[in-house]
């Protein structure tokens, strides 16, 4: 697709961004992202506890409880993806990239330059590079997770539905 980066381009840029620690609290102490994901986590835990008290399906309890653990990880992965997309679109805007082009050493060199120039990161005294997970990223992730990933997971592992389904005999 000439309008979107290839999966290879995205993967390479994510790799080139390298080892970055992501924080939900920015350098100025803004913790809106952290408060947002903590609130989501509390909701998932409360739902899991409610299902436990109501003696509802154990797998649902487990999914809700696990959601509290994985949601911040998905936020971080979404931020990495958005950072990579930002770099790729900056390269394209400045005519240093066509989304149909192959990855070669020139692409890698230019991508590294764009990462250094455009990706806003803070460096700690111990050398760790820190980037901030934006509140908007948490909102986007919540929308994707709640309305797609979580619902599809529940549908895939719906025990009530699968118990009422008859097995289709093998034709082999």
Task: List each language-model region with its residue ranges.
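Phosphate-handling catalytic cores of nucleic-acid transaction enzymes
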Residues: 1-172
């Amino acid at each position: 697709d000439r309008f979107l980066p290839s999966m290879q381009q995205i993967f390479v840029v994510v790799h080139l961004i390298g080892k970055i620690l992501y924080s939900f609290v920015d350098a100025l102490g803004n913790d809106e992202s952290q408060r947002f994901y903590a609130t989501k986590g509390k909701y998932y835990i409360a739902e899991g506890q409610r299902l436990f008290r109501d003696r509802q399906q154990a797998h649902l309890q487990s999914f809700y409880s696990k959601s509290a653990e994985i949601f911040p990880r998905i936020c971080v992965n979404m931020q990495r993806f958005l950072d990579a997309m930002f770099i790729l679109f900056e390269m394209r805007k400045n005519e240093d990239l066509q989304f149909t082009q192959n990855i070669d050493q020139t692409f890698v060199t230019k991508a590294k330059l764009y990462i250094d120039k455009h990706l806003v990161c803070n460096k700690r005294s111990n050398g760790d590079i820190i980037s901030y997970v934006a509140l908007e990223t948490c909102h986007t992730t919540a929308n994707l997770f709640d309305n797609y990933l979580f619902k599809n997971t529940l549908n895939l592992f719906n025990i009530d539905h699968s118990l009422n389904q008859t097995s289709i005999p093998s034709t082999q």
